[in-house]
Protein backbone atom coordinates (compact mmCIF):
# COMPACT_ATOMS: atom_id res chain seq x y z
CA UNK A 1 0.00 0.00 0.00
CA UNK A 2 1.44 3.33 -1.02
CA UNK A 3 0.96 6.48 1.03
CA UNK A 4 -1.33 8.20 -1.52
CA UNK A 5 -3.84 7.05 -4.11
CA UNK A 6 -2.92 9.89 -6.47
CA UNK A 7 0.07 12.14 -6.95
CA UNK A 8 -1.23 15.21 -8.79
CA UNK A 9 1.49 17.14 -10.58
CA UNK A 10 0.34 20.75 -10.92
CA UNK A 11 -1.93 22.77 -8.61
CA UNK A 12 -3.68 24.57 -11.47
CA UNK A 13 -7.34 24.25 -12.37
CA UNK A 14 -7.16 20.72 -13.80
CA UNK A 15 -5.18 19.37 -10.84
CA UNK A 16 -7.38 21.13 -8.29
CA UNK A 17 -10.64 19.85 -9.81
CA UNK A 18 -9.30 16.29 -9.98
CA UNK A 19 -8.08 16.55 -6.37
CA UNK A 20 -11.47 17.80 -5.21
CA UNK A 21 -13.30 14.95 -6.97
CA UNK A 22 -10.84 12.34 -5.69
CA UNK A 23 -11.23 13.63 -2.12
CA UNK A 24 -15.03 13.38 -2.44
CA UNK A 25 -14.56 9.77 -3.58
CA UNK A 26 -12.56 9.02 -0.43
CA UNK A 27 -9.15 8.97 -2.12
CA UNK A 28 -5.98 10.37 -0.62
CA UNK A 29 -4.05 12.79 -2.85
CA UNK A 30 -0.79 14.68 -2.76
CA UNK A 31 -0.72 17.78 -4.98
CA UNK A 32 2.67 19.20 -5.92
CA UNK A 33 3.65 22.26 -7.95
CA UNK A 34 7.04 23.50 -9.04
CA UNK A 35 5.97 27.10 -8.54
CA UNK A 36 5.73 28.72 -5.13
CA UNK A 37 1.96 29.15 -5.41
CA UNK A 38 -1.20 27.25 -6.29
CA UNK A 39 -3.73 28.04 -9.08
CA UNK A 40 -1.35 27.79 -12.06
CA UNK A 41 -1.84 30.54 -14.62
CA UNK A 42 -5.09 31.75 -13.06
CA UNK A 43 -3.17 32.79 -9.93
CA UNK A 44 -4.25 36.14 -8.50
CA UNK A 45 -2.33 38.03 -5.81
CA UNK A 46 -3.34 41.12 -3.82
CA UNK A 47 -1.41 44.33 -4.57
CA UNK A 48 -2.65 47.59 -3.00
CA UNK A 49 -5.89 45.76 -2.17
CA UNK A 50 -6.40 44.81 -5.84
CA UNK A 51 -6.46 41.20 -7.07
CA UNK A 52 -3.80 41.14 -9.78
CA UNK A 53 -3.99 38.45 -12.49
CA UNK A 54 -0.28 37.61 -12.54
CA UNK A 55 -0.39 35.59 -15.76
CA UNK A 56 -2.77 37.76 -17.74
CA UNK A 57 -6.49 38.44 -17.81
CA UNK A 58 -8.71 35.47 -16.97
CA UNK A 59 -12.44 35.97 -17.40
CA UNK A 60 -14.61 32.99 -16.58
CA UNK A 61 -17.33 32.27 -19.14
CA UNK A 62 -19.29 29.17 -20.02
CA UNK A 63 -22.50 27.87 -21.55
CA UNK A 64 -22.31 24.74 -19.42
CA UNK A 65 -24.70 25.10 -16.50
CA UNK A 66 -23.16 22.16 -14.62
CA UNK A 67 -19.69 23.75 -14.78
CA UNK A 68 -21.12 27.11 -13.68
CA UNK A 69 -22.82 25.46 -10.69
CA UNK A 70 -19.60 23.58 -9.93
CA UNK A 71 -17.38 26.70 -9.70
CA UNK A 72 -20.02 28.53 -7.69
CA UNK A 73 -19.48 26.01 -4.88
CA UNK A 74 -16.01 27.48 -4.38
CA UNK A 75 -16.54 31.18 -5.05
CA UNK A 76 -19.18 33.81 -5.51
CA UNK A 77 -18.89 35.33 -8.98
CA UNK A 78 -19.48 38.97 -9.81
CA UNK A 79 -21.25 40.31 -12.91
CA UNK A 80 -18.12 41.32 -14.83
CA UNK A 81 -18.70 41.26 -18.59
CA UNK A 82 -15.73 41.26 -20.93
CA UNK A 83 -15.96 44.34 -23.18
CA UNK A 84 -12.43 45.16 -24.33
CA UNK A 85 -11.63 48.25 -26.34
CA UNK A 86 -9.00 48.80 -29.01
CA UNK A 87 -6.72 51.83 -29.08
CA UNK A 88 -5.38 52.62 -32.57
CA UNK A 89 -3.16 55.71 -32.39
CA UNK A 90 -5.56 57.28 -29.88
CA UNK A 91 -8.75 56.26 -31.74
CA UNK A 92 -10.89 54.06 -29.47
CA UNK A 93 -12.96 51.21 -30.96
CA UNK A 94 -15.24 48.70 -29.25
CA UNK A 95 -14.53 44.98 -29.51
CA UNK A 96 -15.67 42.56 -30.75
CA UNK A 97 -16.42 44.21 -34.11
CA UNK A 98 -19.98 45.48 -33.76
CA UNK A 99 -22.19 48.43 -34.66
CA UNK A 100 -20.36 50.67 -32.17
CA UNK A 101 -17.11 49.84 -33.99
CA UNK A 102 -18.58 50.49 -37.44
CA UNK A 103 -20.24 53.71 -36.36
CA UNK A 104 -16.91 55.01 -35.08
CA UNK A 105 -15.02 53.81 -38.16
CA UNK A 106 -17.40 54.96 -40.92
CA UNK A 107 -20.21 56.96 -39.33
CA UNK A 108 -22.74 54.30 -40.36
CA UNK A 109 -25.82 53.95 -38.17
CA UNK A 110 -27.80 50.96 -39.41
CA UNK A 111 -26.76 47.33 -39.85
CA UNK A 112 -27.63 47.59 -43.57
CA UNK A 113 -25.18 50.49 -43.99
CA UNK A 114 -22.44 48.61 -42.12
CA UNK A 115 -22.95 45.45 -44.20
CA UNK A 116 -22.86 47.47 -47.42
CA UNK A 117 -19.59 49.14 -46.37
CA UNK A 118 -17.91 45.82 -45.56
CA UNK A 119 -19.15 44.23 -48.81
CA UNK A 120 -17.93 47.23 -50.81
CA UNK A 121 -14.43 46.91 -49.29
CA UNK A 122 -14.33 43.15 -49.79
CA UNK A 123 -15.33 43.56 -53.45
CA UNK A 124 -12.71 46.29 -53.99
CA UNK A 125 -9.99 43.98 -52.65
CA UNK A 126 -11.14 41.21 -55.01
CA UNK A 127 -9.65 38.33 -53.02
CA UNK A 128 -11.18 34.97 -53.90
CA UNK A 129 -8.44 32.58 -52.75
CA UNK A 130 -6.68 34.00 -49.65
CA UNK A 131 -3.02 32.99 -49.53
CA UNK A 132 -2.14 34.38 -46.10
CA UNK A 133 -3.70 35.88 -42.98
CA UNK A 134 -3.78 39.40 -44.42
CA UNK A 135 -5.77 38.32 -47.48
CA UNK A 136 -8.02 36.10 -45.36
CA UNK A 137 -8.87 38.96 -42.96
CA UNK A 138 -9.55 41.45 -45.78
CA UNK A 139 -11.77 38.88 -47.53
CA UNK A 140 -13.80 38.57 -44.30
CA UNK A 141 -14.07 42.17 -43.00
CA UNK A 142 -12.58 44.53 -45.60
CA UNK A 143 -9.53 46.80 -45.57
CA UNK A 144 -10.29 49.42 -42.89
CA UNK A 145 -10.99 47.02 -40.03
CA UNK A 146 -8.00 44.94 -41.07
CA UNK A 147 -5.60 47.90 -41.21
CA UNK A 148 -6.70 49.47 -37.92
CA UNK A 149 -7.73 46.58 -35.72
CA UNK A 150 -6.11 43.36 -36.97
CA UNK A 151 -2.85 43.95 -38.84
CA UNK A 152 -0.64 45.45 -36.12
CA UNK A 153 -2.12 43.51 -33.21
CA UNK A 154 -1.92 40.10 -34.88
CA UNK A 155 1.59 40.80 -36.15
CA UNK A 156 2.71 41.57 -32.58
CA UNK A 157 0.95 38.50 -31.21
CA UNK A 158 2.72 36.14 -33.59
CA UNK A 159 5.99 37.97 -33.97
CA UNK A 160 5.73 38.15 -37.76
CA UNK A 161 3.73 40.12 -40.34
CA UNK A 162 0.27 38.94 -41.37
CA UNK A 163 1.51 38.34 -44.92
CA UNK A 164 3.74 35.57 -43.51
CA UNK A 165 1.04 33.95 -41.38
CA UNK A 166 -1.19 31.18 -42.76
CA UNK A 167 -4.78 32.05 -43.67
CA UNK A 168 -6.24 29.26 -41.52
CA UNK A 169 -5.33 31.04 -38.25
CA UNK A 170 -8.55 33.04 -38.64
CA UNK A 171 -11.25 30.84 -40.10
CA UNK A 172 -13.79 33.47 -39.17
CA UNK A 173 -13.86 36.87 -37.54
CA UNK A 174 -16.83 37.51 -35.27
CA UNK A 175 -18.75 40.42 -36.77
CA UNK A 176 -21.93 41.58 -35.05
CA UNK A 177 -24.50 43.88 -36.51
CA UNK A 178 -25.87 44.89 -33.10
CA UNK A 179 -24.74 47.53 -30.60
CA UNK A 180 -23.52 44.84 -28.19
CA UNK A 181 -20.01 45.00 -26.68
CA UNK A 182 -20.18 41.74 -24.71
CA UNK A 183 -17.17 39.83 -26.04
CA UNK A 184 -18.32 36.33 -25.14
CA UNK A 185 -21.47 34.62 -26.35
CA UNK A 186 -21.79 32.82 -23.03
CA UNK A 187 -24.79 32.31 -20.78
CA UNK A 188 -22.65 32.63 -17.65
CA UNK A 189 -19.77 35.03 -17.11
CA UNK A 190 -17.92 36.69 -14.26
CA UNK A 191 -14.88 36.89 -12.01
CA UNK A 192 -14.73 35.23 -8.58
CA UNK A 193 -14.98 37.85 -5.84
CA UNK A 194 -11.66 37.85 -4.03
CA UNK A 195 -9.77 36.37 -6.99
CA UNK A 196 -9.07 32.94 -8.46
CA UNK A 197 -6.45 31.87 -5.91
CA UNK A 198 -9.06 31.79 -3.12
CA UNK A 199 -11.33 29.69 -5.36
CA UNK A 200 -8.59 27.12 -6.07
CA UNK A 201 -7.64 27.12 -2.37
CA UNK A 202 -11.20 26.04 -1.57
CA UNK A 203 -11.00 23.28 -4.20
CA UNK A 204 -7.80 22.01 -2.58
CA UNK A 205 -9.18 22.27 0.95
CA UNK A 206 -8.44 19.06 2.84
CA UNK A 207 -5.82 17.89 0.32
CA UNK A 208 -2.08 17.94 1.05
CA UNK A 209 -0.23 20.44 -1.16
CA UNK A 210 3.54 20.83 -1.49
CA UNK A 211 4.94 23.82 -3.40
CA UNK A 212 8.36 24.40 -4.99
CA UNK A 213 8.56 20.71 -5.86
CA UNK A 214 9.91 19.87 -9.33
CA UNK A 215 8.38 16.53 -10.29
CA UNK A 216 10.70 15.89 -13.23
CA UNK A 217 13.79 16.48 -11.07
CA UNK A 218 12.73 13.85 -8.51
CA UNK A 219 10.36 11.63 -10.42
CA UNK A 220 11.19 8.20 -8.99
CA UNK A 221 10.98 9.23 -5.34
CA UNK A 222 7.69 11.05 -5.93
CA UNK A 223 6.17 8.22 -8.00
CA UNK A 224 6.97 5.83 -5.15
CA UNK A 225 4.54 7.75 -2.93
CA UNK A 226 1.36 7.10 -4.93
CA UNK A 227 -0.54 4.42 -6.79
CA UNK A 228 -1.22 6.67 -9.80
CA UNK A 229 -0.08 9.99 -11.21
CA UNK A 230 -2.13 12.84 -12.70
CA UNK A 231 0.37 14.89 -14.70
CA UNK A 232 -0.53 18.41 -15.86
CA UNK A 233 2.94 19.62 -16.85
CA UNK A 234 4.32 19.84 -20.41
CA UNK A 235 3.90 16.49 -22.13
CA UNK A 236 7.17 16.80 -24.10
CA UNK A 237 9.14 17.54 -20.91
CA UNK A 238 7.69 14.41 -19.28
CA UNK A 239 9.28 12.33 -22.03
CA UNK A 240 12.57 14.24 -21.90
CA UNK A 241 11.84 15.98 -25.23
CA UNK A 242 12.84 12.71 -26.89
CA UNK A 243 10.87 13.53 -30.06
CA UNK A 244 11.77 17.24 -29.96
CA UNK A 245 10.23 20.25 -28.19
CA UNK A 246 6.67 21.40 -28.87
CA UNK A 247 6.46 25.11 -29.63
CA UNK A 248 4.57 27.75 -27.65
CA UNK A 249 4.01 31.46 -27.75
CA UNK A 250 5.01 33.16 -24.55
CA UNK A 251 3.90 36.39 -22.90
CA UNK A 252 5.81 38.86 -20.77
CA UNK A 253 4.23 41.32 -18.35
CA UNK A 254 5.42 44.64 -16.97
CA UNK A 255 3.29 45.36 -13.92
CA UNK A 256 3.31 48.62 -11.99
CA UNK A 257 1.36 50.41 -9.29
CA UNK A 258 0.18 53.89 -10.32
CA UNK A 259 -0.81 56.70 -8.01
CA UNK A 260 -4.19 57.24 -9.67
CA UNK A 261 -7.55 55.65 -8.99
CA UNK A 262 -8.37 54.99 -12.66
CA UNK A 263 -5.78 54.72 -15.43
CA UNK A 264 -7.70 53.67 -18.55
CA UNK A 265 -11.35 53.24 -17.62
CA UNK A 266 -11.52 49.61 -18.74
CA UNK A 267 -10.03 46.28 -17.63
CA UNK A 268 -8.57 45.48 -21.06
CA UNK A 269 -7.34 47.86 -23.75
CA UNK A 270 -5.75 46.33 -26.86
CA UNK A 271 -3.13 48.42 -28.68
CA UNK A 272 -3.71 47.52 -32.30
CA UNK A 273 -1.03 49.63 -34.02
CA UNK A 274 2.32 48.05 -34.91
CA UNK A 275 4.42 50.79 -33.30
CA UNK A 276 3.30 50.32 -29.66
CA UNK A 277 5.47 47.42 -28.45
CA UNK A 278 2.90 45.87 -26.10
CA UNK A 279 -0.29 44.14 -27.26
CA UNK A 280 -2.51 45.34 -24.43
CA UNK A 281 -2.75 46.91 -21.01
CA UNK A 282 -4.74 45.28 -18.23
CA UNK A 283 -6.03 47.44 -15.39
CA UNK A 284 -6.83 44.81 -12.78
CA UNK A 285 -9.15 46.74 -10.45
CA UNK A 286 -11.89 46.92 -13.12
CA UNK A 287 -12.34 43.11 -13.00
CA UNK A 288 -13.88 43.53 -9.55
CA UNK A 289 -15.22 47.10 -9.88
CA UNK A 290 -12.54 48.34 -7.47
CA UNK A 291 -12.60 51.77 -5.84
CA UNK A 292 -9.10 51.66 -4.30
CA UNK A 293 -7.12 54.95 -4.29
CA UNK A 294 -4.33 53.43 -6.43
CA UNK A 295 -4.36 51.20 -9.49
CA UNK A 296 -2.24 48.35 -10.87
CA UNK A 297 -1.63 47.95 -14.60
CA UNK A 298 0.14 45.23 -16.58
CA UNK A 299 1.55 45.83 -20.04
CA UNK A 300 1.45 42.59 -22.01
CA UNK A 301 4.13 41.77 -24.57
CA UNK A 302 3.98 38.79 -26.89
CA UNK A 303 7.24 36.84 -27.02
CA UNK A 304 8.88 33.97 -28.86
CA UNK A 305 9.15 30.99 -26.56
CA UNK A 306 12.38 29.16 -25.82
CA UNK A 307 12.95 26.23 -23.48
CA UNK A 308 12.87 27.48 -19.89
CA UNK A 309 10.37 30.27 -20.63
CA UNK A 310 6.80 30.16 -19.35
CA UNK A 311 4.72 28.35 -22.02
CA UNK A 312 1.38 30.10 -22.64
CA UNK A 313 -0.20 29.28 -25.99
CA UNK A 314 0.36 26.12 -28.01
CA UNK A 315 1.29 26.84 -31.63
CA UNK A 316 -1.51 25.07 -33.44
CA UNK A 317 0.12 24.41 -36.79
CA UNK A 318 0.53 21.18 -38.75
CA UNK A 319 4.11 20.56 -37.57
CA UNK A 320 3.34 20.89 -33.85
CA UNK A 321 0.05 19.03 -34.24
CA UNK A 322 1.88 16.07 -35.80
CA UNK A 323 4.55 16.13 -33.08
CA UNK A 324 1.92 16.22 -30.33
CA UNK A 325 0.13 13.25 -31.94
CA UNK A 326 3.37 11.26 -31.52
CA UNK A 327 3.71 12.35 -27.89
CA UNK A 328 0.08 11.43 -27.29
CA UNK A 329 0.85 7.85 -28.39
CA UNK A 330 3.62 7.73 -25.77
CA UNK A 331 1.30 9.26 -23.15
CA UNK A 332 -1.47 6.75 -23.90
CA UNK A 333 1.01 3.90 -23.47
CA UNK A 334 2.31 5.21 -20.13
CA UNK A 335 0.95 2.96 -17.38
CA UNK A 336 -0.56 4.55 -14.28
CA UNK A 337 -0.32 8.14 -15.53
CA UNK A 338 -3.17 10.44 -16.57
CA UNK A 339 -2.12 13.40 -18.74
CA UNK A 340 -4.39 16.43 -18.54
CA UNK A 341 -4.75 20.17 -18.88
CA UNK A 342 -3.34 22.82 -21.17
CA UNK A 343 0.27 21.60 -21.06
CA UNK A 344 -0.41 17.90 -20.58
CA UNK A 345 -2.63 17.85 -23.67
CA UNK A 346 -0.88 20.65 -25.63
CA UNK A 347 -4.16 22.43 -26.13
CA UNK A 348 -5.57 25.93 -25.86
CA UNK A 349 -8.15 25.47 -23.13
CA UNK A 350 -10.68 27.97 -21.79
CA UNK A 351 -11.17 27.57 -18.04
CA UNK A 352 -14.61 26.01 -18.30
CA UNK A 353 -13.31 23.40 -20.75
CA UNK A 354 -10.44 22.50 -18.39
CA UNK A 355 -12.97 21.93 -15.61
CA UNK A 356 -15.19 19.90 -17.94
CA UNK A 357 -12.25 17.73 -19.00
CA UNK A 358 -11.05 17.18 -15.41
CA UNK A 359 -14.57 16.28 -14.25
CA UNK A 360 -14.98 13.81 -17.15
CA UNK A 361 -11.66 12.10 -16.47
CA UNK A 362 -12.30 12.02 -12.72
CA UNK A 363 -15.75 10.49 -13.22
CA UNK A 364 -14.31 7.67 -15.37
CA UNK A 365 -11.28 7.16 -13.13
CA UNK A 366 -13.07 7.20 -9.77
CA UNK A 367 -16.22 5.25 -10.62
What is each residue range found by the language model?
Residues 215-330:
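Mid-domain catalytic core of redox enzymes
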Residues 39-41, 88, 94-95, 146, ...:
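Short catalytic/ligand-binding loop motif for oxyanion handling, primarily in non-cytosolic enzymes
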Residues 310-367:
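C-terminal catalytic lobe of FAD-dependent flavoproteins
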Residues 48-123:
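Dinucleotide-binding Rossmann-like beta1-alpha1 core, especially the glycine-rich loop
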Residues 89-93, 99-228, 232, 236-239:
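Active-site/ligand-binding neighborhood in enzyme catalytic cores
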Amino acid sequence: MKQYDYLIVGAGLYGAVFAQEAKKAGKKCLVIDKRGHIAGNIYTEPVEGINVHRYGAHIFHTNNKAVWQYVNQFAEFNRYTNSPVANYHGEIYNLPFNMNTFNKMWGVVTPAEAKAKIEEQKAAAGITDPQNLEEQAISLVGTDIYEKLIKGYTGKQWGRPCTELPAFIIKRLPVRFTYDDNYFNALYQGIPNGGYTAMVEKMLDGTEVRLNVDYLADRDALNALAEKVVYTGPVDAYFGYRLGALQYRSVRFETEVLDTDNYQGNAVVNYTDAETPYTRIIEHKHFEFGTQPKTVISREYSAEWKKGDEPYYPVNDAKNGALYAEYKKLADAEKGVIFGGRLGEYKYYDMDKVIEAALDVAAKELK
